[in-house]
UniProtKB/Swiss-Prot annotation:
SUPFAM superfamilies: Nucleotide-diphospho-sugar transferases (SSF53448), Trimeric LpxA-like enzymes (SSF51161)
Record-listed E.C. numbers: 2.7.7.27
Record-level GO BP terms: glycogen biosynthetic process
Designated name of the protein: Glucose-1-phosphate adenylyltransferase
Top EC class for this record: transferase
Binding site for alpha-D-glucose 1-phosphate: 114, 179, 194-195, 212
InterPro entries for this protein: ADP-Glc_PPase, ADP_Glu_pyroP_CS, GlgC_bac, GlmU/GlgC-like_hexapep, NTP_transferase_dom, Nucleotide-diphossugar_trans, Trimer_LpxA-like_sf
Organism whose genome encodes this protein: Salmonella typhimurium (strain LT2 / SGSC1412 / ATCC 700720)
Length: 431
């Protein structure tokens, strides 16, 4: 382990990102989000009133000084590719800056699609090698968080690691969805189990497990060796969490990086923010958290901005209808191009170009772009997918049995409405 002086750290914070390439794994379907990902990959799902989920990983790279980025795509990639082409074309080719889109190459052993997360990188190795990076930062494209990857790179170098895994404590009942690790006093990973049925608890805290965040830093040459060996292993599932990280752990070459060391937050006393919005309830809740008085995730931090594709839209408008009812909102996010006419919106998130007509009550709802809500509707605890037209007088979120019959209702009572569901409902009513 190398002990670095403050001046050395400042220098490395500038140099290491320039020697690195980031690979964002963005091919996941996100089946737990149900119909919300039927026509888009999970990283392309809308979030926070104006963003896409992948904007967080991309913005973290940009803010950390990593300007060479590969985005590995697969499932329903058109929306994702279009978003990146329109919103992330700010890099300078003359300065060797880029965002490369890397689809499934469909050339390894006759496979059409990626066999696992590690295979997604393996299939693109010939392209990745051309980047001539010393370090490879591998990221999930479907998490909400702010992280300075340069700090993680410094930790990687300081510990003399060949592989570094970002980690944070999670409630033990949720740890079955993550890779869970045990570490020694030097943060060396001494045990790693992917999605265990009975997650081991952290020493001194039986209520939590130490979970992998799916964020890795590798020495580039070491990663290439690992992937070449894994590709030849017919018994492997070709996955970082299931195969690569356990192998490195057995070899004693993997170290943990505690997320608080690199988490970017305005309030240093706050809990580090990282969300895997993989379920409908988690997605709904993370969106509504941003509309609270003091959100856990600060989206107004000018020192760490989250970028996205910006459309030229007029400001949101709140108008009085002909009967004299005022358009009002409280504790909500309302994006450009929205019009609220004679209705009340409370604790909700409205994406661009949402139109709410008179006499509506919108409470704890997430309305994606171009949603049109007819007069006298009541929407509560729901997510309305893009371009849905909610008929006049429709009530959602008040009758569990009716919601489950017409739409998708989660066990927690969150209702998802899509255009296809509304179309089927209309056909049924016309019979």
């Amino acid at each position: 382990m190398v002990s670095l002086e403050k001046n050395d750290r400042v220098m490395l914070a500038r140099q290491l990102p320039l020697k690195s390439v980031a690979l964002i794994l963005a091919g996941g379907r996100g089946t737990r989000l149900k119909d919300l990902t039927n026509k888009r990959a999970k990283p392309a799902v809308h979030f926070g009133g104006k963003f896409r989920i992948i904007d967080f990983a991309l913005s973290n790279c940009l803010n950390s000084g990593i300007r060479r980025i590969g985005v590995i795509t697969q499932y329903q990639s058109h929306t994702l590719v279009q978003h990146i082409q329109r919103g992330w074309s700010l890099f300078s080719e003359e300065m060797n800056e880029f965002v490369d889109l890397l689809p499934a190459q469909q050339r390894m052993k006759g496979e059409n699609w990626y066999r696992g997360t590690a295979d997604a990188v393996t299939q693109n190795l010939d392209i990745i090698r051309r980047y001539k990076a010393e370090y490879v930062v591998i990221l999930a494209g479907d998490h909400i968080y702010k992280q300075d990857y340069s700090r993680m790179l410094i930790d990687h170098v300081e510990k003399g690691a060949r592989c570094t895994v970002a980690c944070m404590p999670v409630p033990i009942k949720e740890a079955t969805a993550f890779g869970v690790m045990a570490v020694d006093e030097s943060d060396k990973i001494i045990d790693f189990v992917e999605k265990p049925a009975n997650p081991p608890a952290m020493p001194g805290d039986a209520s939590k497990s130490l979970a992998s965040m799916g964020i890795y830093v590798f020495d580039a040459d070491y990663l290439y060796e690992l992937l070449a060996a894994d590709d030849k292993d017919d018994a492997s599932s070709h996955d970082f969490g299931k195969d690569i990280i356990p192998k490195i752990t057995r070899e004693g070459m993997a170290y943990a990086h505690p997320f608080p060391l690199s988490c970017v937050q305005s309030d240093p006393q706050a809990e580090p923010y990282w969300r895997d919005v993989g379920t409908l309830e988690a997605y709904w809740k993370a969106n509504l958290d941003l509309a609270s008085v003091t959100p856990e995730l600060d989206m107004y931090d000018q020192n760490w901005p989250i970028r996205t594709h910006m459309e030229s839209l007029p400001p949101a408008k709140f108008v009085q209808d002909r009967s004299g009812s005022h358009g009002m909102t409280l504790n909500s996010l309302v994006s450009g191009g929205c019009i609220i006419s004679g209705s009340v919106v409370v604790q909700s998130v409205l994406f661009p170009r949402v139109r709410i007509n008179s006499f509506c009550n919108i409470d704890s709802a997430v309305l994606l772009p171009e949603v049109w809500v007819g007069r006298s509707c009541r929407l509560r605890r729901c997510v309305i997918d893009r371009a849905c037209i909610i008929p006049e007088g429709m009530v959602i979120g008040e009758n569990a049995e009716e919601d489950a019959r017409r739409f998708y209702r989660s066990e927690e009572g969150i209702v998802l409405v899509t255009r296809e569901m509304l179309r089927k409902l209309q056909v049924k009513q016309e019979r």
